[in-house]
Each structure stands twice: as C-alpha cells, then as structure tokens.
Amino acid sequence: MSRQLYLDCDGVLADFDKGAQAILGLPPRAFEKRHGLGRFWAKLASAPDFYFSLPLMPDAMELYDAVKHLNPVILTGLPRGNWAADQKVRWAAQHFPGVRIITTMAKDKRNHAKSGDVLVDDQVRHRDRWEEIGGVFIQHRSAAESIEALKAYFPL
C-alpha cells in the first residue's frame, strides 16, 4: 500500500505556543480563557507576519530528518479570515524549502487524504474525521514518540 505522510505545522514543526505567547503576553490557552476566542485571534491576526515569524519546535528538525526520504507534505489548518495562508506558505518555504504545503481549514484536512495516509498532528480534535476516511492518526507529543509510532507504517 502506498501511503502519504502528512505533518501538521503548528505544534509539530512550528512553535505556535511560543510565538503566540510573545504576542499575547500570556500562554495562549490562558489568554483565550481570559479574553475570549475572538480577541485571541484578532490580536494574532493584527501582529505583523505572525505565522511567518514562528520559531521551529525544538525537535522539528529531528522529526523532519527522520522522514524527509518519504517526501512528507505539510498539512496545516487555517484560522478564519484570509490572513494566514500566505504567512504559512512562506514559513514552510523558509524552514523546509521544496516541501509541499497544503493550507486548509482544520476540519477539512481529511479531504486531502486517502485511506492509509498518515497524519502526525498534536491536536486530536479532528482525529475521528481523519480516521473515518481510513487514515492513520498519530498524536504528536515529541519527535521521538512520533518517529517511533511512524515505524509501524514506514521504513525509518
């Protein structure tokens, strides 16, 4: 079976929480709880090049180096509005030149997969939607754990 490997961006390759905390002055979940989701996204959207300026996750290159021979695709969810896609595409080009990136609403990630495809993602919210189409979902906690889990599906 031919499988495609998809890597989520925020929380797997890009350190969303670190970048967001620098803008918000609080950890993202704390800011959202205190000020609401609308203000959370409005503040990030108004920050110049928020997504483009995100740092790499500390172990992002460890994960990527282990799977680059599989030609992974970055499959990343977008917030509402039309402000983030270009920033994410430029971020991927800077950190992972030549790697294909697909930007979509998180709930629609499964529309880009076929049965057997593997997604490494830190957010389990849409796990069921991915698995409904026959995809394999690996919850990312660290590069080491994800690499170990991927060995069941790919030669690493």
Protein language model regions, located:
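Conserved Lys-Pro-Asp/Glu-containing loop-to-beta segment of HAD-superfamily phosphomonoesterases
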Residues: 4, 103-130
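Active-site neighborhood of HAD-like aspartate-dependent phosphohydrolases
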Residues: 1-45, 132
